[in-house]
Amino acid sequence: MLEAAGRNRNALAATPGEGWALHRMTPASRLNGANGIRTGADGRIYVAQVAGSKVSAVNVDTGLIETISPNGGGIVGPDDLAFDEAGNLYCTEITEGRVSMMTPGGEYRVIHGDMPVANPITYHQGRLIAGELRLGGRIMELDRDGGAPRVIYEGVPMANAFEVGPDGKLYFPAQGANEIWRIGLDGGEPEVVAKDLGVPDSVKFHPDGYIVSTQVYSGQVLKIDPRTGAKSILADIGPGLDNVAFVNGRTFVSHINGSITEIVEAGRTKPLVEKGLQWPLGLAVDEAGHVLVADGGFSYLLRPGEALQLAGMLFSPGFPGWIRDVAASGPDEWIVTTANGDVARWRPAAGESTVLASGYARLMGVAVGPGGDAVFAEFDTGKVFAIEGRAKGGGAGSGNVVELASGLDRPMGVAVAGDGTVFVAESGAGRVVKLVGGRRETVLDGLARPEGIAIAGGTLFVADPGANAVIASDLAGGARETVASGLPIGGAAGAQMAQLGGVGDMCGPMNTFNGIAAAPDGTLYLSADAEGSVLALRRL
């Protein structure tokens, strides 16, 4: 049995099938990432979680976490949040391009529905102000009764988490300029407060009057004098920082990976919530048994007996983009599909990537065949393609892309057998098919919503989040077995997690994908997105 844990702690325990053992390779995550944070009237920190379409509240003394707005609730992809004096919660929904409100009684409504890449939001003396994380973005005062907004300023190079300072002006990161600006609430021309930063993504005022700003690229938390722009380092936590909140003079910062850290004093920190995985998505194992874990805007390497090591992120040199699935193609070399519709070869250690094919709609699974062809599935069109001979050690070009199949029902996972036969999981049809001479033959049916698939030792393994199970089928005889059930994959009782749209020009649709991969030693690795961990399954 694998007891429920982390953000999935109220679920049922998972059960391995007869002859199988099941355990976690990484701890279960307690949050679905951590984006905007704000202190509530009750002294708890409220956390917006884009990946989980969730808002949670964290007790800073006990670490206890309570879900305030759940996945599947009325708030979708919240990036930042604010409260008014009546206790109404306002959230920017970055993938929906809107601002929504939840009342203390749990009722939802949209405040403003035309704000592409909605991100920062704050409330000050009866005024609700929100902005857009895009080049040329707007900062606007919103009418909470649904009237037309008032534009405070248009033309910001990516506004992020902001706050009104003691002088009554709005201070905000101009992220694209790598600067902090301020502007009067009635408009005018902005002034530069600080420059030459580490890509700031939040500006908050400590009760003592100085600015605390997280730097998403450098990973530093800076203390900045709003009068002179002079700065010093409060902490160096690592790339991916997001936001800041204060509780009774204590300083807390969030990280996109789901951690919340208290800065006790300059240079000294302690965790409130430990880091984890936001999703995770696709998995691949190389010949050395190293596992690459795709976690959207982050990817990690998992080596047996070691903790997760960051392989790359959206701000890393050569990172190919928001990654959905991965396949091993050589030492420190991986083929990936991205939310932007690209297939790319990525070499994390070298900090470089090469686009092999582009312009596709919602790419899902990818696999590399014995001859080096990269096979990938396009969800929206129901097609499967191959890049001939360019996946392993090819040059910089895109390669020759050929269509292998069309008319598939929401294809997701792909796998290639040792003889080159291509297998595809049709999530919409609840089956796995193989492609033979332009025809499709059903290999395994009666599934709920198959996603990731893998082949090892003549056996097909299927991650089926619709059934919260992993199924195995003997490709020679067709016999099937349940490898594990009650797994923390997908939603409760097989429900699908909220599917998110894109984030402006930065990222295409952020759809979930349950990956499964087989290691040379026979171990199966599974992305457990419901709890944010990687699981391992082994035959006894």
What are these model-derived regions, one by one?
Residues 1-22, 132:
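Blade/loop signatures of beta-propeller domains
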Residues 22-28, 64-71, 106-112, 147-153, ...:
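A short beta-strand motif characteristic of beta-propeller blades
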Residues 49-61:
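Beta-propeller domains
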Residues 59-63, 102-107, 142-147, 183-188, ...:
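Short loop/turn segments that connect beta-strands within beta-propeller blades
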Residues 509-540:
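Blade-level signature of beta-propeller repeat domains, shared across WD40, Kelch, NHL, RCC1
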